[in-house]
């Protein structure tokens, strides 16, 4: 077996691992709904603490705590991507109609495909652009039924316009994080645990500054929070990191548009949403 074939095989395996994040994010909406009325920053603080703690235990068991000793730029990209995306997203939803803001924020897979062309040795092919554009069109169709009058209906409202701008910033932050992670592939995936723990601390500070605490009402809500921390807000970030660093970044970007569709199916199957052609919020 040649070196090139081994490298291609490793890339394909990493891409499959990265696709696991998309499957996990498909359960995000269901688990978030199951967690009750907990404020967003409080929920982020709890779930990122679980996800980061899980990664910390794993790194310690493997004797890999040295993975946290990374240059400042690695921490800036990691924490900026995780906390920056969620902080901007929460702020956008407070100002703009949720379905429309979510659709704008969900430009990130398309931006990943486009930005990947800036990486050394990468080429942007027409099929990737077409695939990403079709994926965005499909996601737009899912959200269209929930849009409250369309983006243009709120264009003169300065606060709503700010919400759209924040949602667009979300898309740039997450796509930038994903593409820059490829440039920083020397940083081990275990470092993501540190990013999660810092994100949890920043979310806790934001919660106490801007929100009123609400405790989970029952064991089912606690189970949903733990599920979020272990899955969509935990393992998903680790496998995404490995995938974007070692797999086919463009394919992962295109495939990410499957998340809203899968999320819709899960919500309908669980009885949290009617079986219609629209979706109120994205899986990521």
Task: Give the positions of each predicted feature.
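Glycine-/small-residue-enriched transmembrane alpha-helix faces in small-molecule transporters
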Residues: 1-45, 87-88, 132, 137, ...
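Specific transmembrane alpha-helical segments of multi-pass solute transporters/efflux pumps
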Residues: 24-29, 62-105, 141, 230-247
């Amino acid at each position: 077996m040649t070196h090139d074939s081994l490298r291609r095989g490793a890339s394909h395996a990493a891409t499959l691992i990265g696709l696991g994040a998309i499957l996990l994010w498909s359960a995000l909406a269901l688990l978030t709904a199951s967690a009750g009325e907990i404020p967003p920053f409080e929920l982020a603080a709890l779930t990122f603490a679980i996800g980061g703690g899980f990664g910390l235990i794993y790194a310690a068991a493997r004797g890999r705590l040295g993975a946290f000793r990374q240059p400042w730029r690695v921490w800036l990209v990691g924490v900026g991507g995780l906390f920056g995306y969620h902080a901007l997203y929460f702020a956008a939803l407070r100002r703009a109609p949720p379905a429309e803001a979510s659709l704008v924020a969900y430009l990130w897979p398309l931006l990943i495909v486009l930005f990947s062309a800036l990486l050394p040795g990468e080429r942007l092919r027409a099929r990737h652009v077409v695939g990403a554009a079709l994926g965005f069109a499909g996601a737009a169709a899912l959200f269209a039924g929930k849009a409250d009058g369309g983006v243009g209906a709120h264009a003169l409202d300065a606060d709503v316009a700010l919400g759209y701008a924040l949602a667009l910033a979300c898309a740039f932050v997450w796509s930038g994080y994903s593409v820059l992670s490829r440039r920083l592939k020397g940083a081990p995936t275990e470092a993501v645990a540190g990013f999660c723990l810092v994100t949890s601390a920043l979310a806790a500070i934001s919660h106490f500054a801007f929100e009123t605490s609400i405790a989970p009402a029952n064991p089912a809500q606690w189970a949903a929070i733990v599920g979020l921390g272990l899955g969509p807000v935990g393992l998903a970030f680790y496998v995404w990191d490995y995938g974007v660093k070692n797999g086919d970044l463009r394919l992962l970007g295109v495939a990410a548009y499957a998340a809203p569709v899968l999320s819709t199916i899960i919500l309908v199957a669980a009885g949290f949403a009617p079986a219609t052609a629209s979706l109120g919020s994205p899986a990521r």
